[in-house]
Swiss-Prot record:
Molecular function GO labels: nucleotidyltransferase activity; sulfurtransferase activity; tRNA binding
Entry-linked Pfam families: CTU2
Organism the protein comes from: Lodderomyces elongisporus (strain ATCC 11503 / CBS 2605 / JCM 1781 / NBRC 1676 / NRRL YB-4239) (Yeast)
Pathway listed: tRNA modification; 5-methoxycarbonylmethyl-2-thiouridine-tRNA biosynthesis
Intrachain S-S bonds: none
Family: Belongs to the CTU2/NCS2 family.
Major localization listed first in the record, in broad terms: cytoplasm
GO biological process, one term: tRNA wobble uridine modification
Name the record gives this protein: Cytoplasmic tRNA 2-thiolation protein 2
UniProt cross-references to HAMAP family, sorted A to Z: CTU2
Lineage, opening ranks: Eukaryota, Fungi, Dikarya, Ascomycota, Saccharomycotina
GO cellular component: cytosol
Domain of life: Eukaryota
Length: 448
């Protein structure tokens, strides 16, 4: 039995008022307006801090209003979060004489390459649709559409050899023309690895954008269902040590600035957000933004880890076991910071900037058999000779050593194979807090 039911019987009263109920969720029945208030109440609970509330100041006093950056993907959850935040701002404005508790900036990171007319038109169309959407609200909302293009100065060819040593080499003259994130990801034969590396860049870009816009908070529309997928996906991709720091509301330090990361819908399931979108007439925009999203594979072997887990979670709903997602998230929230091996000092991954608590090279060498079985027959020796003459090691071991976590080693092996991948190194970005804009690894192309 599914978790959401439409009521066909007449005479059933809403749990909160005397209006006729139309929907049953979590064993409770709601009318349309009460259900919308139920969803909005969940967001307000997660963002109940005073910095998001209207402040009355004495004459002559000054106060800087909190700015909130909404990570907007165009999916159902981000559409609902935009609507909920905009409705909250409208309520604050009407109740408190045009005062607002915070300012809202909606940021969409376009996955087009930004190098040809078609991709530029795609970014322009996203901007137009977003402007049309925010125009429905009686509050001022800033919109930014950004295409992350990587400065070639910071790009390296990163490779991993059979002993799990990691190297970074300068690009050849032919490779220095690469500047688009889309170009780099298209070269990867493994969609899961591409998705993993893309997430790293997107998160860094959101932090950079929040800093440049003066935002002290980034909000994601992730539901409990999505957070459960993240817990499982991080574990599968070898990033289990990051679970505790990924799904919790937290504060991240970015170039000296403290930025809060919040998931206002962490107590709601995906189907509950989708029903809100249906009742609020937001699904038309979901269809409009879907045209510009990266298409999902329908073939199981080509699906990313996240796509497979999403399909798996849908089956939980159909079988009536969706509450398992809540259990997964609660277990993930209880995880703590890992301890370093033998009390050794921690260091950061040069790709994702996450802390490394145990050397992944030692672990991989311990669980991997690198020595072959002894050759017995002439046929086996002939096969070995054919392999050695045909196989060339394309990874240059003359480059500098780089520190990579287990997840990034796995992603690079999946994305680049024997030749490695072209990718920026976090340690190459030296930020001067006085002149931060001169040291951007990601160049911003924004349409306003």
């Amino acid at each position: 039995m599914k978790s959401l039911e439409y009521l066909t019987e007449t005479g059933i009263k809403c749990l909160k008022c005397d209006e006729g109920a139309i929907i049953k969720v979590r064993s409770d029945v709601y009318c349309k307006q009460c259900y919308l208030r139920f969803i909005r109440g969940k967001q307000r609970k997660q963002m109940s801090s005073d910095k998001y509330k209207v402040k009355y100041l004495r004459d002559g006093a000054s106060h800087s209003t909190e700015k909130v950056l909404l990570a907007f993907s165009g999916g159902v959850s981000s559409l609902v979060l935009l609507d909920v935040l905009a409705r909250l701002l409208e309520e604050q404005k009407n109740t408190h004489r045009d005062l607002q508790g915070f300012e809202l900036v909606v940021a969409n990171i376009s996955e087009s390459d930004g190098t040809n007319l078609e991709s530029l038109l795609s970014s322009s169309s996203i901007m137009q649709t977003l402007l049309e959407l925010v125009g429905n609200y009686e509050v001022s909302i800033k919109v930014k559409v950004v295409t992350p293009n990587i400065d070639p100065v910071f790009l390296r060819r990163i490779g991993v050899d059979y002993e799990f040593n990691t190297f970074a080499n300068n690009l050849s003259i032919e490779e220095q023309s690469v500047s688009s994130l889309a170009e780099i990801l298209r070269a990867s034969p493994n969609r899961s690895s591409s998705e993993d590396l893309r997430d790293v860049i997107f998160h860094q870009e959101l932090l950079r954008l929040a800093q440049s816009e003066g935002c002290g908070t980034i909000v994601y529309g992730h539901s409990m269902s999505r957070l459960a997928i993240e817990v499982l996906a991080l574990t599968v991709k070898g990033r289990g040590s990051n679970v505790h720091s990924t799904i919790l509301d937290r504060v991240e330090d970015y170039c000296g600035d403290q930025i809060s990361i919040i998931y206002p819908f962490r107590d709601l399931f995906e189907y509950e957000l989708r029903e809100y979108a249906v009742l609020s007439d937001l699904m038309q925009y979901e269809s409009a933004f879907a045209k510009y999203a990266v298409p999902k594979s329908k073939v199981s072997k080509n699906m990313t880890v996240r796509e497979i887990l999403s399909m798996y979670l849908d089956r939980w709903d159909e079988s009536g076991y969706l509450s398992t997602a809540s259990t997964v998230v609660k277990i993930g929230e209880k995880l703590t910071v890992p301890t370093s091996q033998n009390n050794s000092s921690t260091y950061c991954c040069d790709i994702c900037a996450k802390k490394i608590y145990q050397d992944p090279k030692d672990w991989l060498q311990m669980i991997t058999v690198n020595e072959p079985a002894p050759l017995v027959s002439d046929e086996e020796r002939d096969y070995l000779h054919q392999y050695l003459t045909s196989h060339t090691d394309t990874i240059s071991k003359s480059g500098e050593h780089v520190n990579l976590c287990y997840g990034c080693i796995t992603a690079i092996n999946g994305a680049g194979g024997d030749s490695g991948v072209i990718w920026p190194l976090q340690k190459d970005v030296k930020f001067d807090h006085g002149e931060k804009e001169k040291a951007k690894v990601l160049k911003e192309y924004s349409l306003e």
